[in-house]
């Protein structure tokens, strides 16, 4: 069932030092640690410009996954709060691969779940494919998104202005915490997926790298609810977050497959270097091409 307690703590410390980056070539990006625990205010699953100013905003901070089987729940996420990490889902991680797209494998007893994160080029869209590789019977999977909706250089805290409502759309819901932001469309390709509205603030997420640098590193994040669905062995479901709605959720699978097939594998130093270099070439909405000095500060 993943690592032993001592080994998992060693793995956690090492993994929190390793960060991943994927860009959309338009100034937007996904960046977090390889265990999906944000350690910087610049981290998030969707950080993107929302207008012509080129300023990037953290829209989607994270997505927490919970596996439910035989009446037991196993939260696969990892967050830092004052004095502790909770939940401690890193202990279920058995493998991480970066090519062709960041992929994490979890083992919970006899259940093995694979998560593939795909940031789409030339479109503000994140797709995550979950595949149940092994299981004695069907499992329930819950996906809970956490939102920030703030400038990437700032932090957000619980407030009465944030709109915690979710509006139903085909295949999911749309959310918008503040009226001057675009809608964020959350959809899946699972016909039987249900979104359970449960708006709530979660308090005091800590970003260790910010605190180490002498900056404020505490943030509150809002969740509007969670998706719940059933997965059978060898079945997959794809979660999509985008500032543009997908009219037909059944097309999500094909979109994911097409985008993934276009990714080149990073098999040697040269291919890794080429891949990394392309991350910093940006084409703005007005057609300008730029080379960024670096992510995340100059994105």
Q: How does the language model describe each region?
A:
Residues 78-121, 202-208:
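Extended, loop-rich substrate-binding clefts of extracytoplasmic carbohydrate-active enzymes
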Residues 12-102, 184-192, 247-249, 253-260:
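An extended acidic
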Residues 70, 107-111, 135:
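Short strand-coil-strand connectors
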Residues 1-7, 11:
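Single conserved hydrophobic/aromatic residue that forms the stacking wall/gate
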Residues 65-67, 102-107, 167, 229:
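Short acidic-hydrophobic surface loop/beta-edge motif
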């Amino acid at each position: 069932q993943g690592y032993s307690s001592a080994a998992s703590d060693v793995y956690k410390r090492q993994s929190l030092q390793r960060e991943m980056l994927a860009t959309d070539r338009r100034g937007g990006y996904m960046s977090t640690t390889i265990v999906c625990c944000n350690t910087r205010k610049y981290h998030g699953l969707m950080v993107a410009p929302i207008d012509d100013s080129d300023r990037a905003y953290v829209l989607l901070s994270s997505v927490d996954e919970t596996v439910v089987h035989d009446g037991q729940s196993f939260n696969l996420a990892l967050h830092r709060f004052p004095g502790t990490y909770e939940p401690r889902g890193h202990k279920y991680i058995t493998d991480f691969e970066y090519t062709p797209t960041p992929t994490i494998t979890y083992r919970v007893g006899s259940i093995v779940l694979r998560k593939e994160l795909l940031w789409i080029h030339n479109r503000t869209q994140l797709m995550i494919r979950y595949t149940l590789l092994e299981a004695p019977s069907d499992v329930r999977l819950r996906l809970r998104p956490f939102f920030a909706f703030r400038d990437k250089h700032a932090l957000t805290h619980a407030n009465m202005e944030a709109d915690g409502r979710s509006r139903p759309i085909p295949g999911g819901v749309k959310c918008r915490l503040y009226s001057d932001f675009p809608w964020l469309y959350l959809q899946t390709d699972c016909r039987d997926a249900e979104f359970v509205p449960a708006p709530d603030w979660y308090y005091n997420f800590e970003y260790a790298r910010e605190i180490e640098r002498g900056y404020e590193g505490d943030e509150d994040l809002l969740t509007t609810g969670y998706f719940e669905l059933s997965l059978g062995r060898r079945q997959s479901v794809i979660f999509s977050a985008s500032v543009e709605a997908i009219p037909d959720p059944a097309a999500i699978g094909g979109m994911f497959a097409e985008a993934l097939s276009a990714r080149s594998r990073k098999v040697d130093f040269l291919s890794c270097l080429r891949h990394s270099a392309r991350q910093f070439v940006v084409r703005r909405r007005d057609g300008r091409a730029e080379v960024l000095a670096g992510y995340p500060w100059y994105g």
